[in-house]
Amino acid sequence: MFTCEAGIASVQQAIKDVAEGKFVIVIDAASRENEGDLILAGEKVSTEKMSFLLSHTTGIVCASLSREQAKSLDLPAMVQDNQCAFKTAFTVSVDASSGVTTGVSASDRTRTVQLLADPAATAESFVRPGHVFPLISQPGGAVQRPGHTEAAMDLMRLAGMQPCGIFAELVNPDHSMMRQQQVLAFAEQHDLTVITVDDLITYRYTYDSLVTKISSARLPTKYGDFSIHVYESIIDGTQHFALVKGDIHEQEAVPVRVHSECLTGDILGSCRCDCGAQLDMAMRYIAEEGLGVIVYLRGQEGRGIGFGHKIRAYALQDLGYDTVDANLQLGFPIDAREYGMAAQVLKDLQLTSVRLITHNPRKFFELQRLGIHVLDRIILPVSISTENEGYLRTKKERMGHWLDLPVLDDVEEEYETVERMSCR
């Protein structure tokens, strides 16, 4: 069932507030800046609102713009070699070219922001440098880059505003950065809506259309005929696909496998993992049921770290690291995969509810969080060998996977029907 009503409701309220010219607060991840920013629609700015912004923040007023806007206003990158930890895309700073004095006062910066939000403004409307800092938003918004720049732009678009949101980082009276509890107290004091960047990303995966179906065909396989549907992400152009068996339109309790790309396991028959066996068993199960879907997510090699890094992790595993510590040693999360595109594909297929073929609790609950009605899970046998036993036990013991692993000596007797048992 859907499990993030509070976050979704907060985003809906934030969108309403932005449209009404109110400030909202957006908090990013603790692993990122871990800060709260006041955000306001540029076209709704006033001297009074600018004064409030300057009084409670660092005073560095940023304005999110699209790449096209920056180009039309002749706003090049501030530096050619961006060494910022989060690659924040600053352009040269600006002031309005008329109607201001020094450019730094609340009224002067209000005038500058109003021009940035004005679609009739031109490059000649500004002087450079100045006291307002335009930032270029990634075209995919917060889904592509989970920063305040993109969050501001997403909120402007969702609220029907001009694509220019202003924002600045909240600070305490001693000018230290506000952290989450301080931000929440400030929001309560000033009756402001607070959302997180993750809330906004979830909202977009739930309500936006972020994939486009680009082709479909019949696909005969060793398990019979499937239909294959290719989807392209509008965020980064990655092409994912769905294998469909039977008439699934508005069906309930449809068996679904969400499978992350694994070239070594799915194609090369690697014995280090059970990915290829899981894919085979899911296809067989769905074929026998006569109904089901396999969503194949491209670009998720090595639990999202990429193919080259996955092979580096293999080398570390040969030195004694398990699959978790190998990722950490390379500087990556244990599991960097996201399932938003899977949710998008399932929604496009118009499934009412699903039964998920998985041992992975994170996948199960993440799809629920993204609005997919997951009724229950389907457990298929585990393909275990001397080569992948440690990998599977790490998934069970360190990643919490729902795995009931047999004693290896009993494998062939217990799971004689499971393919890919030749890995010794």
From Swiss-Prot:
This is Riboflavin biosynthesis protein RibBA. HAMAP family: RibA (MF_00179), RibBA (MF_01283). D-ribulose 5-phosphate binds at residues 32-33, 37, 145-149, 169. Zn(2+) binds at residues 262, 273, 275. Its cofactor is Mg(2+); Mn(2+); Zn(2+). It catalyses: D-ribulose 5-phosphate = (2S)-2-hydroxy-3-oxobutyl phosphate + formate + H(+); GTP + 4 H2O = 2,5-diamino-6-hydroxy-4-(5-phosphoribosylamino)-pyrimidine + formate + 2 phosphate + 3 H(+). It comes from the Bacteria. Residues 207-424 are annotated as: GTP cyclohydrolase II. GO terms for molecular function: 3,4-dihydroxy-2-butanone-4-phosphate synthase activity; GTP binding; GTP cyclohydrolase II activity; magnesium ion binding; manganese ion binding; zinc ion binding. The gene is ribBA. Its EC number is 4.1.99.12, 3.5.4.25. Pathway: Cofactor biosynthesis; riboflavin biosynthesis; 2-hydroxy-3-oxobutyl phosphate from D-ribulose 5-phosphate: step 1/1; Cofactor biosynthesis; riboflavin biosynthesis; 5-amino-6-(D-ribitylamino)uracil from GTP: step 1/4. Catalyzes the conversion of D-ribulose 5-phosphate to formate and 3,4-dihydroxy-2-butanone 4-phosphate. In the N-terminal section; belongs to the DHBP synthase family. In the C-terminal section; belongs to the GTP cyclohydrolase II family. Mg(2+) 2 binds at residues 33, 148. The active site is at 335 (proton acceptor), 337 (nucleophile). Mg(2+) 1 binds at residue 33. GO terms for biological process: riboflavin biosynthetic process. Residues 1-206 are annotated as: DHBP synthase. GTP binds at residues 257-261, 278, 301-303, 323, 358, 363. The keyword Lyase applies. GO terms for cellular component: cytosol. The record marks 131, 169 as: Essential for DHBP synthase activity.
